Amino acid sequence: MIILKQKQKYYNIENLLTKKAEYNILLGERSNGKSYAVKYMTLWEAYHKEDYLTHEEKTRYMFGYVRRWREEIKGRDVAQYFEDMPISKITEGEYDSVICYRGDIYFSSHDEEGNETRGEKIGATFALTGVTHYKSLSFTKIGNVIFEEFITNTGYLSHEVDNLQSLISTIARRERVAVYMIGNTISRLCPYFDEWQLVHVKKQ
């Protein structure tokens, strides 16, 4: 497990990727670019089907987008989450946006009249409240998982840490999956810090 706290304006994710940790915790101010860096990397790998650093071919090139509540993974909200991404640059002009349809995430493009065409599937959404539902499903192409705003001031789920670990186990199926847990605030009341005995984080 790697914990990365940065105070500079923008995150450089390449150093984090070299650690090859399963769980990566990114903490910092809301505007310092940690979400941007993770989203850019995951979208790049999803399109190119290659490792972001080594450019080696990846079979698990898709990503999972995790939130606590099902209401947070509605299609409109997921699309808005990726609105700040330079999709045209990442996809070399093939697509211009990201959309979510029935829980799956796709690249998409628009013609001159604004008509939308859904492209290839690049990911899937997950709610921690529905981990039991996912257990019977297969996610063999997902290699990255984004858990946005894992620190909250509005309350955690009962057994939330177990739910997350169960979900990751369902996705990974004995293979390596990289999880990026992004937190915008530091709260001493965080079950992840307690469960994983991250005492030094709580004191900072």
Residue ranges and their predicted role:
Residues 1-204:
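Phosphate/NTP-binding elements of NTP-utilizing enzymes
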